[in-house]
């Protein structure tokens, strides 16, 4: 169970004197690096996302999920995991491609409201929220590269992650389902779980989904500047989940004191570069530390969780860790909303640690790879059985 005493580092990214080249920038940059080295994530204070915008994005999710199923089914897209999806009648998702571009968001709302001009308020809310989270992502990535002395690669790095294939995935879990899970879980969401729904149905569910689509109701919405992100706005509905699991490494706390667990998302690492996550009111996120302890992250206004992914770990030659984390909802009869951007390398970008990060003390840990190939392996039959995806896919044998 997540500890209430342990806390993630809290870093203020909205200080008025925080400008590149300033003493405050150097101070915060050092704090960001240490947090990512120690925890793989941190809590960012960023009051540039107004409380009004926070409430607007959550009201947007409520309005979208309240639409009839036949209306949501109008949301179609040829890309995998984008467009309307129903997941074993336990959750559903909507998707927007290139969600940083307002006209694309308008196309999405016009699918749902075809007899008018879509929904201008929803479109603008999604765009504004995506832009703010992208500001955090770009700032943190710049600080990371500067702190390791590879600032000469910053511009190329930002261009290599241009927001070209952004998506908005809205995922919801049916309320009061009462799901009991008995699973063999070895890595993260790669595990195949046998799910028995409390509504009397027996469902075999494959929980191997990508960063854009999380079984606990995450979001993915992309947008912004110079980065390929998926910004997610989603929900966790309290699904009264009991878990009895065998794990191959990172546990899902098997039957701890027979306590009912509300597991929205099994233990996993993200495969992308960075995730910037916003929890709205209902807590649930738990992060695993180096010494195998869980930190339960409590939501608060104007704070966002910045999480490093496997791709960043490889790019930085293992100097930054990608933390295992999960979602465990304990609130009763309440819906948990979250929103996040997932920054991913664009197609054909090869992830390789710069030569400046490789020396006798830090030998090369991972072979160069294309993010799409890593993701394909992650979802393959072989990949689903692997405990540590990144190491299994591209670790240097001598490392």
Swiss-Prot record:
Name of the protein this chain belongs to: Probable inactive 2-oxoglutarate-dependent dioxygenase AOP2
Binding site for 2-oxoglutarate: 336
Highest classification ranks of the organism: Eukaryota, Viridiplantae, Streptophyta, Embryophyta, Tracheophyta
Cofactor binding annotation: Binds 1 Fe(2+) ion per subunit.
Keywords, sorted A to Z: Iron, Metal-binding
Pfam family, one: DIOX_N
Domain Fe2OG dioxygenase: 248-345
Binding-site list for Fe cation: 268, 270, 325
InterPro entries: DIOX_N, IPNS-like_FE2OG_OXY, IPNS-like_sf, Iron_ascorbate_oxido_reductase, Oxoglu/Fe-dep_dioxygenase_dom
Similarity comment: Belongs to the iron/ascorbate-dependent oxidoreductase family.
Cofactor: Fe(2+)
GO molecular function, one term: 2-oxoglutarate-dependent dioxygenase activity
């Amino acid at each position: 169970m997540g500890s209430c005493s342990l806390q993630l580092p809290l870093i203020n990214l909205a200080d008025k004197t925080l400008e590149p080249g300033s003493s405050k920038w150097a101070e915060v940059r050092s704090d960001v690096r240490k947090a990512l080295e120690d925890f793989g994530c941190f809590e960012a204070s960023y009051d540039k996302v107004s409380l009004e915008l926070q409430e607007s994005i959550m009201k947007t999710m409520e309005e979208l999920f309240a639409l009839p199923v036949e209306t949501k089914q109008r949301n179609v897209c040829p890309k995998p995991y984008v467009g309307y999806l129903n997941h074993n009648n336990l959750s559903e998702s909507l998707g927007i491609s290139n969600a940083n571009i307002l006209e694309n968001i308008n196309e999405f709302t016009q699918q749902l409201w075809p007899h008018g001009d879509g929904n201008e308020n929803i479109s603008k809310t999604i765009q504004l929220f995506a832009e703010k989270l992208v500001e955090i992502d770009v700032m943190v990535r710049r600080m990371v590269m500067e702190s390791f002395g590879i600032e000469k690669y910053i511009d190329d790095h930002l261009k290599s992650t241009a927001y070209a294939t952004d998506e908005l995935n809205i995922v919801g879990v049916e309320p009061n389902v009462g799901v009991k899970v008995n699973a063999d879980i070895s890595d993260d969401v790669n595990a195949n779980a046998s799910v028995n729904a409390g509504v009397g149905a027996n469902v075999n569910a494959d929980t191997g989904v990508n960063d854009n689509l999380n079984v606990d109701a995450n979001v993915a919405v992309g947008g912004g500047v110079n980065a390929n992100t998926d910004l997610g706005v989603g929900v966790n509905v309290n699904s009264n989940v009991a878990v009895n699991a065998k794990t191959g490494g990172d546990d899902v706390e098997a039957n701890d004191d027979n306590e009912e667990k509300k597991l929205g998302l099994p233990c996993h690492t993200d495969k992308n570069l960075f995730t910037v996550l916003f929890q709205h009111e209902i807590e649930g996120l738990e992060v695993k530390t180096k010494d195998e302890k869980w930190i339960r992250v409590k939501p608060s206004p104007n704070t966002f969780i910045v999480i490093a992914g496997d791709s960043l770990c490889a790019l930085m030659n293992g100097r930054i860790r990608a933390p295992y984390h999960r979602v465990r909802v304990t609130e009763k009869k309440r819906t948990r909303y979250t929103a996040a951007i997932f920054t991913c390398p664009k197609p054909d970008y090869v992830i390789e640690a710069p030569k400046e990060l490789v020396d006798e003390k830090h030998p090369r840990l991972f072979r160069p790879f294309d993010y799409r190939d890593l993701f394909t392996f992650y979802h393959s039959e072989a990949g689903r059985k692997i405990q540590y995806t990144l190491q299994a896919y591209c670790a240097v044998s001598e490392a």
